[in-house]
């Protein structure tokens, strides 16, 4: 299958956009390092929604609208992974038992707790963005979410079975670091030093989540990758805010 068909598949897989594609999961996963590009597409949509909301609503509502639009536009897929990983982190037993809990459709206190922490912090971070960088911040946040996902995949151990292993294997490319640098430079051009810091924080966050998964579950699943997307968005926004504050921009 050509790259265009695979890219359509990746966009359809990552969003609620009803694009027709015959790409298999292996075809889609082959473009794992292109995921930040899809993140940019998502970021433009989220940023536009946030700016539009800011014209008629106060800041707190704008933050809720932007975050709500982001998780809806991505089909709530990654949010589900965040909840599942939270439940597994709170469990005890063997690695296999924790993986079983992660795949359990029921929601526990660990998942709800992690969801509350990440969602509330993300909303607060969006609310704290200066109006002049609202669009840029939301755009960089979505790109960084995908960068974080690739960072997590890069250090993860694939579990036989499931979709996550295809993305993990595809991330083991000699070009992964170049992709991270490219998006850090792009973020710098968009928002200066804070933008580059945001992407760097996302990379480190992804690696951290991957290492946490290795220690707690031995393997990583699609849920772990999904969780890294949500945490990556949050951490990149926090990094952006911290850099803005420290640099006085």
Swiss-Prot record:
**What processes does the entry annotate via GO biological process terms?**
cobalamin biosynthetic process
Which residue spans traverse the membrane?
Answer: 37-57, 59-79, 107-127, 177-197, 199-219
Q: Name one Pfam family in it.
A: CobS
Q: Name one GO molecular function term.
A: adenosylcobinamide-GDP ribazoletransferase activity
Got a GO cellular component term for this one? plasma membrane
Q: Which family does it belong to?
A: Belongs to the CobS family.
What name is this protein filed under?
A: Adenosylcobinamide-GDP ribazoletransferase
